Amino acid sequence: RPSTGPRPGRPRTGCPSRAPPRGGGGGARAAPAPQPGVSDLPALVEQMREAGLPARLATEGEPRALPAGVDLAAYRLVQEGLTNSLRHAGARARAEVTLRYGPRELEVGVADDGRGAAQEELSGTSGHGLVGIRERVALYGGILSVGPLAGGGFEVRAKFPLKDGQ
């Protein structure tokens, strides 16, 4: 019996397809979505408020363009810090995000007045969030401090070095 097309389970070979390419053709790919940065922090803080965490953003110094990696790392630190506050700080906790532009560094932090964190969270054995933040901060030459606050609550804070003009 003569073949009338490719057999099931076998790729078609030999004859080029006459059908237009899938996805609109032309070979053009969609541009990747831009990475978030510190300019997106007001929207992130608002999302956390809507999710039930009273949060505010305080900015000190003159905002300026940051190296892309530092910009993303700072955003991710705040995202992780606020997410942890929402999950672990307790029903009545509040969070504050601080962003300080210094002449040669960017300092970014999240502090809450909640319950704090369990030791396994601090050591990085109960998830990957803080481990990922440690790695991102180190990648850009920053210094990370994570831990309970003296009066209760918890803080995640990083300082990223900036070159002149950044």
What spans do the regions from the language model cover?
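Glycine-rich ATP/GTP-binding catalytic cores of kinases/NTPases
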Residues: 2-166
